[in-house]
Structures are given as C-alpha cells and as structure tokens.
From Swiss-Prot:
GO MF annotation, one: 2'-deoxyadenosine deaminase activity
GO cellular component: cytosol
Protein name as it appears in the record: Adenosine deaminase
Reactions it catalyzes: adenosine + H2O + H(+) = inosine + NH4(+); 2'-deoxyadenosine + H2O + H(+) = 2'-deoxyinosine + NH4(+)
GO biological process, alphabetically ordered: adenosine catabolic process; hypoxanthine salvage; inosine biosynthetic process; nucleotide metabolic process; purine ribonucleoside monophosphate biosynthetic process
Chain positions recorded as substrate binding sites: H17, D19, G172
Enzyme Commission designation: 3.5.4.4
Binding site for Zn(2+): H15, H17, H199, D279
Site residues, Important for catalytic activity: H222
Amino acid sequence: MDFQTLHQLSKTELHCHLDGSLSLSCIRQLAKMIDRKLPATDDELRRLVQAPADSENLGDYLKAFDFVAPLLQTKKALQLAAYDVVEQAAEENVRYIEIRFAPVFSLAGGLSLVEATQAVIEGLHQGMATYDIMAKALVCGMRQLPNTDNQTMFKTTAPLLGSTLVGGDFAGNEADFPTNVCAPAIKTAQSLGVPLTFHAGECHCPQNIGEAVRLGIPRIGHATACFDQPALIEKIVETGTTVELCLTSNLQTKAARTLAEFPYQALKKAGAKITINTDNRTVSNTTLTQEYQRYQQAFGTTAADFLAFNLNAIDAAFIPDADKKSLRDQLHQDYATYC
C-alpha cells in the first residue's frame, strides 16, 4: 500500500502522550499566551521539541519534554493542547484515541489536579464535537515521584472517571524506578477501580514487564525488552495482556538498538495482542500513518494485520462494550476494501 492508502485506513491509538504530541502551530499559540519568545523558523523550533538524533537512552529522549511543560499551566492551554492532538489524529483517520497526560506537571500556575484534568477533558470534548473521532483521557502517575504523590493523584482524579477520563498509567524514569518500586501506587489505583496501562520494558529490563503482568495490569506500554524472552512472551499471551508497541520511539531511545531487537515479530508469531502507536507525535517526529508505513516496510505488515491490531486496541480500550461494538463494526466496514 502506498502512503496515501495507509493514510486513508481507519486507525486506533492507545498510547499517545499529550505533551509529546503538540503541533508546532499549537506550541506557538501556547507560547504567545504567556509571551514566551520562540525561534522564528519551524526548523529551529522543531530542534527544541524533538528528541535529539543522538539520544543514547530513554533519559535523553525525555529531556525534550522539558521545553513544553511551562506552556501547559492554565486551563485554556490544556484545552487547546488536547484539542490539537485530537485534530491531528482525526486528520489521519484515527477513529479512537486515548491521550495520556500527567496532571502533576500542570500545577505550577496554580491549577489543582482536578482542574488540570477537567481542562484536558474539555479539550477532548471540543475535539469530538468538531471531528468524527472518539477521544478519551488517561492520567499518568510518574514513577520518579514518591508513591504518596501518585496515590494522591489517583485518589483525587478517580471521581472524574466516566465517559471521557477512562483510566491511568505510570510513565517516567523506568531505569531508576522499576515496577516493584511503584507497586504501592499501582495497588492504590487498582483499589480505586482505575483501569491501568503501564510503561515497562523501555530500558532493557524484561523483569519490569513480568512484574507488571504479575500485578494484573492488562496493558503494557512498549514491552520492548521481551524481544528475546520467550517465557515472558508466553506469559503475555497466556494472560491476554495487550502490548502498546511504539516502533519509532523505541529506536530513538535505544530501547531497541535495531529492528532485530524490536519485539513485533516475536509477539506476532506467539499470538500476542499487538497494537501500533506513535507514543509522541512531535518528540518522535512521527504520525500513526508513518508508523504503519514503517511496519509495512520493515516487516511486510498487511492491511489484514492492521485491522487485527486495531481490533486488539478496541478490545483493550477502557470503554463500554457498546462503544467497542460500534467501533469494531466501523473498522470491519472500513477495511472491507483492503482485506
């Protein structure tokens, strides 16, 4: 399939970070709101908000987020940001997207956790009112923060769970804060009924994936380190865990040093529930259509595969069964021409 055909395919995305996915035009709009001076050209601005080409690890990659954080400190800014990411997704025929963000990073201007979360929800509502897309939010705990901070975040935002805020995540510095360190906050979120996904396996640490699966988390973001761990892959399949793959991001962070270290083929062969994601559209300089093209070029991924992966995403989405059925029906109809 050529790029235009891939663009036309209906898509779903479970793993997309708000602060890592803002368009350059949105960044300029947000900066103007706080009188922050930006480089005159987009090429110069892009260098500030994209991961450096010479990233050595996840830590280097995460530094790109520091530039955007000060721009997301008001309700209006968060609304605009959420709308912007929904717009980008809708323009490449994403039918369902979950956008994740850490409300704790938007408190410097005086917002509360609830206010920051509600602002993102409102931005998603505005996007859905404009475009033919279903957009949901996930709140992220940050693994480098004390468990008590993450527990407070989940306790505070859990009452907002409903039609738009649908779940939670843990992101951040995995190398220094492995899964077992986060266990108390994970268990708190689970006790509150927060559906969880969890970043694991981005730092050559398969044990973090295994521990997350053992803790009963149904979705794993990245899971890159399982590529040469057949017993772990078997456990992923056995438990029905869904994997949120992020190819471009993993190559940038060196979670996968080469395509051979990316777990797609091993997971697919084993029958694991795979999904395709951007991770961070801007930081990784990618789109979901570009990700599809990379899978097709690297692995020979077919339209039938893409349909299966999208159906996996709908099965794993934190939404009611009626919404899942509607989305499945739409996907089957949209892919009938290609499969």
